[in-house]
Regions:
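Extended, low-hydrophobicity, polar/charged segments
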Residues: 2-147
Length: 147
């Protein structure tokens, strides 16, 4: 992000911390402002999976998301498949680390409520805080209903 001159702040924490909820506590931010990145596949799979960024306090509704994306059916990728598709470890999957790799990135629409969001920097133990507008600009993400 330095290369792209995007203002941001990096948070480092113990890599054993796995949940976005725990990260929210450590960063002193509400869980709604901390985004988790989920790998979601069409069912049956076709092409690259979706990277779905959403507030950590929310649970995904695959039927709602499928309708938002114009898909008949979606499924969560397994941890193994998520790591295979992204070459990143679960807990460190980040759209920011996968720029220009052909993934379709979507952000759950409630994240628009916040000026700044925190998300994985692409490695366990590192998160990055940036303006929501910069995240959308960098990733080309579109806002969708997913809950």
């Amino acid at each position: 992000m330095e290369q792209r001159k995007v203002p941001h702040e990096v948070f480092e924490f113990d890599a054993s911390v796995r949940s976005a909820q725990e990260v929210a506590q450590l960063a002193g931010m509400p869980p709604e402002q901390v985004l988790k990145t989920l790998v979601v596949e069409a069912d049956p799979p076709k092409g690259k999976p979706y990277l779905v960024m959403m507030p950590s306090a929310l649970e995904i509704d695959l039927k709602v998301l499928a309708a938002s994306l114009g898909e008949k059916k979606l499924r969560m990728a397994s941890h193994r498949d998520s790591e295979r598709h992204t070459a990143l470890k679960v807990g460190g999957i980040s759209a920011l680390a996968l720029l220009d790799r052909g993934f379709i990135v979507v952000i759950e629409e409630t994240a628009e409520l916040f000026d700044e969001v925190l998300m994985s920097a692409g490695q366990r133990g590192f998160d990055v805080k940036m303006a929501y507008a910069d995240l959308v600009s960098l990733t080309g993400a579109r806002s969708v209903a997913a809950v």
